[in-house]
Design a protein with these regions (language model features):
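Short acidic, glycine/serine/threonine-rich loops at helix termini
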Residues: 36
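Long, low-complexity, charge-rich intrinsically disordered regions
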Residues: 39-167
Length: 167
């Protein structure tokens, strides 16, 4: 008997369940299935707008973990496309609130371009490195964030990590 998650992965031809456990057939398919079901809004803690996005990104507090476009740009040290949004996970809400308070005169609430997500998953924090989430998480968050800049970023990730491709 298999649970509904394993059944779903079997139906998508991602895994094969047998008496000795699971065999992963396609890591890329698992990643893309996760990406299509991912909803960033569910983890959104704060959203705001700071017009000078580049300086805000460079000046983020130490206890945030970059993801999505800025996460890949930091990890790969290149930008496959220009982006106008920053997504990151906040590990210390009090410190982030202080960071926001210091920039209060620059912060607007309309048309947000900075998205702070809750880092409630200890695994997410433990698998991050140098203030950036792991590559599969970056891929999934870019896919979920969508927008015109998403496709060049996703293609660049797959070119750098072919195991993440669908086929």
């Amino acid at each position: 008997m298999t649970n509904k998650v394993v059944r779903k992965l079997e139906q998508a031809s991602c895994v094969e369940a047998g008496p000795r456990g699971l065999r992963v057939l396609s890591p890329g398919r698992i990643l893309n299935l996760w990406a299509t079901e991912r909803r960033l809004q569910g983890e959104m803690w704060k959203s705001l707008r700071i017009d000078d996005l580049a300086s805000a990104e460079a000046d983020l507090p130490r206890d945030v973990i970059l993801t999505a476009f800025s996460g890949w740009a930091t990890h790969a040290k290149r930008r496959p496309a220009e982006y106008a949004r920053i997504h990151f996970y906040v590990t210390d809400k009090t410190a982030f609130e202080s960071w926001m308070e210091f920039r209060r005169d620059k912060v607007r609430r309309t048309n947000p371009n900075i998205f702070a997500l809750e880092a409630h998953d200890l695994h997410l924090v433990n698998t991050s490195s140098r203030g950036v989430v792991c590559v599969p998480q970056i891929y999934v968050d870019i896919y979920a964030a969508d927008g015109p800049e998403a496709q060049p970023f996703l293609k660049d990730i797959v070119a750098s990590f072919p195991a993440l491709a669908l086929w």
